[in-house]
């Protein structure tokens, strides 16, 4: 593994940068120094939540004191005095000032937060509920302490009093916890939807999906489909979980450290040291796990893709009787995933060994420190249970990394996969994660929008290759001057069409063409979308551009008069690539030309599955339509429908000749 590759699997600044670039846009635009503003907004939101929680706590305490004065006089005197002291202190004024300042921060960013208020509102509600849940946990720790002390002292009145309080707290807590969990998942779903649409927008922009094709030798971005589906779902859910877990840990740490400090300072400091030790060891082990989890995601995706390929090419495999080879290839992918998974479970076992020892040993520490204090009469019996609870809560907060290291390493792997994907989508289309240069220095073919298709001194090469397909080619295809491109297989005929479409730009020279909306490309194997027959016909238009009569007339024109009736109408939904023969699919593709009526149609052996008579009828119909066509083909009969012929020869040579019909 190279040093650059090793850096992909470390807890470092690059990992943080990729995380921010992926996570921040949902809440705040990404830009120079914008991350600081984003983090400042989160801090301001926390200030708002803390201030509102403070006022709510004081108000509820005063309200409860007014309703149950006898109870608070006997059992909650310290609480009432503390709240009263808080009210008389500068704290309320500080809270009001903090609220005003935090509000001003959000108001100052209102333009950049447009259409983002819902996520901030949900996040604020979640933080508020998190504060409430932590407050209820603190209350329960004291309730348990009083219950245990009452049982030990056989004080029935206090026992039943606090048992009723426990019941009330549970009744209040259950709907709050349910609401918290629901909103947590809801925000995760909304975030996933937004982030997926954000990635899809970039994936389809500038034909990035083509340049990032995982079948290409020129990209290191494997399985973009998995990154958009599984990795984004994992990223949004786990990010939200970790964010709230970290905040929960901070609140728990503050709340229960104070309780622990009042019981035993020795216990508190020993706990902090123990947690730091566990975190350091967990991170050291986890760094190795990031790479293993990254590989597991990649290998599982490759295995799944192998099965998808078999499903999509079942008929071809059956004709070739290639079941044995296909099974071997799919099994090899499975074994690759299994080998890596075996390595993964070894490391997971090592982490589990450390985690179990770490967690079991922690149960001894409170008793070792607290028992002598109780036996000496310095603590009441209920303090033992409260100390154990507080110790466990604080340890859980401090040991977040230790206990979640396996999830964190899986999360880091997802961050790296999404980060690489995001960086590639933002890069120039001809620089998308390609391997190192082969040593052949390419220029770039220039594309110019014009009224015709014309090539000026075009030299074309495959991406990252020194092979010359066509050298210094100049030609013009004026309206009606149909062009036929012929030549031996592998000579570069289809590559020339890719250059005209703007898919390939390795080489030099200038290509003039109309806007892509005025061009329609028909490959040899037509693309059948997942949609109705109507949607097949109007593709690539998203909305219907013709009425039913015109669509049916077009089907008749391409010699498919009974197709709609055969499948139950234009709105029938089928797996068209399976139920239609290749010849029928090619005629559907030609129907798209008659429906969309482009100025130029480029046919890459688009009639190869048709008989000569069908081919002749369709070319005559295209001529009557007024669309200028550029065809790639091998049949000599194609010359009857074109005005000029470009013959692509070996070593970049070519010849243009007129066709006299």
Curated annotation (Swiss-Prot):
UniProt superkingdom: Bacteria
Gene3D superfamilies: ABC transporter type 1, transmembrane domain (1.20.1560.10), P-loop containing nucleotide triphosphate hydrolases (3.40.50.300)
Cellular component terms (Gene Ontology): plasma membrane
Compartment(s): Cell inner membrane
InterPro entries xref list: AAA+_ATPase (IPR003593), ABC1_TM_dom (IPR011527), ABC1_TM_sf (IPR036640), ABC_transporter-like_ATP-bd (IPR003439), ABC_transporter-like_CS (IPR017871), ABC_transporter_sub-D (IPR050835), P-loop_NTPase (IPR027417)
Residues of the ABC transporter domain: 453-659
Keyword tags: ATP-binding, Cell inner membrane, Cell membrane, Membrane, Nucleotide-binding, Transmembrane, Transmembrane helix, Transport
PANTHER family: ATP-BINDING CASSETTE, SUB-FAMILY D MEMBER (PTHR11384), LYSOSOMAL COBALAMIN TRANSPORTER ABCD4 (PTHR11384:SF59)
Family (UniProt): Belongs to the ABC transporter superfamily.
Protein name: Uncharacterized ABC transporter ATP-binding protein sll0182
Organism annotation: Synechocystis sp. (strain ATCC 27184 / PCC 6803 / Kazusa)
């Amino acid at each position: 593994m190279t040093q650059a590759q090793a850096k992909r699997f470390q807890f470092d600044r690059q990992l943080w940068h990729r995380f921010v670039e992926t996570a921040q846009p949902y809440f705040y635009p990404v830009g120079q120094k914008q991350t600081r503003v984003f983090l400042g907004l989160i801090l301001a939101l926390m200030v708002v939540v803390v201030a509102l929680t403070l006022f709510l706590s004081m108000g509820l305490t005063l309200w409860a004191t007014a309703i149950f004065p006898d109870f608070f006089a006997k059992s909650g005197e310290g609480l009432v005095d503390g709240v009263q002291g808080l009210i008389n202190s500068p704290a309320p004024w500080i809270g009001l000032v903090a609220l005003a300042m935090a509000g001003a921060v959000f108001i100052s960013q209102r333009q950049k937060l447009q259409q983002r208020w819902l996520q901030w509102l949900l996040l604020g509600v979640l933080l508020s509920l998190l504060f409430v849940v932590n407050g209820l946990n603190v209350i329960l720790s004291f309730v348990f302490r009083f219950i245990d002390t009452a049982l030990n002292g056989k004080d029935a009145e206090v026992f039943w009093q606090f048992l009723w309080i426990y019941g009330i707290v549970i009744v209040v807590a259950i709907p709050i916890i349910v609401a918290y969990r629901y909103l947590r998942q809801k925000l995760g779903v909304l975030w996933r939807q937004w982030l997926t649409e954000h990635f899809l927008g970039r994936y389809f922009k500038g034909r990035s999906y083509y340049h990032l094709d995982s079948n290409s030798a020129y990209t290191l971005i494997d399985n973009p489909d998995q990154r958009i589906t599984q990795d984004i779902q994992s990223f949004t859910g786990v990010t939200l979980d970790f964010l709230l877990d970290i905040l929960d840990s901070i609140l728990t740490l503050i709340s229960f450290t104070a309780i622990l400090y009042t019981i035993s300072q020795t216990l508190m400091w020993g706990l902090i040291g123990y947690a730091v030790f566990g975190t350091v060891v967990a991170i050291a082990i986890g760094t190795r796990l990031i790479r293993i989890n990254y590989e597991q995601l990649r290998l599982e995706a490759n295995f799944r893709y192998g099965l998808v390929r078999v499903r999509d090419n079942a008929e071809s495999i059956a004709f070739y009787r290639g079941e044995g080879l296909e099974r071997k290839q799919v099994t090899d992918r499975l074994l690759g995933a299994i080998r890596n998974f075996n390595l993964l479970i070894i490391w997971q076992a090592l982490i589990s060994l450390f985690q179990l020892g770490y967690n079991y040993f922690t149960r001894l520490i409170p008793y070792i420190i607290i028992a002598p204090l109780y036996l000496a009469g310095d603590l009441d019996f209920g303090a033992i249970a409260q100390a154990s609870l507080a110790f466990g809560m604080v340890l859980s907060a401090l040991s977040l990394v230790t206990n979640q290291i396996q999830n964190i390493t899986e999360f880091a792997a997802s961050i790296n996969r999404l980060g690489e994907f995001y960086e590639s989508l933002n890069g120039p289309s001809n620089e998308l994660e390609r391997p190192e240069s082969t040593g052949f220095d390419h220029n770039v073919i220039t594309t110019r929008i014009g009224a015709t298709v014309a090539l000026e001194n075009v030299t074309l090469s495959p991406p990252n290759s020194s092979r010359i397909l066509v050298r210094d080619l100049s030609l013009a295809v004026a309206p009606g001057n149909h062009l036929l491109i012929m030549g031996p297989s592998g000579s570069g005929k289809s590559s020339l069409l890719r250059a005209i479409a703007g898919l390939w730009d390795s080489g030099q020279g200038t290509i003039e063409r109309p806007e892509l909306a005025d061009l329609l490309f028909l490959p040899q194997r037509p693309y059948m979308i997942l949609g109705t027959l109507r949607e097949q016909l109007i593709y690539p238009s998203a909305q219907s551009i013709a009425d039913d009569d015109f669509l049916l007339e077009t089907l008749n024109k391409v010699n498919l008069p009974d197709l709609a009736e055969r499948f139950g109408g234009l709105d029938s939904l089928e797996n068209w690539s399976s139920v239609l023969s290749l010849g029928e699919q090619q005629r559907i593709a030609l129907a798209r030309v008659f429906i969309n009526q482009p100025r130029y149609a480029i046919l890459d052996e688009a009639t190869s599955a048709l008989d000569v008579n069908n081919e002749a009828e369709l070319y005559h119909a295209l001529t009557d339509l007024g669309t200028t066509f550029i065809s790639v083909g091998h049949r000599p009969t194609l010359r009857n429908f074109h005005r000029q012929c470009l013959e692509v020869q070996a070593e970049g040579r070519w010849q243009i000749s007129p066709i006299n019909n």
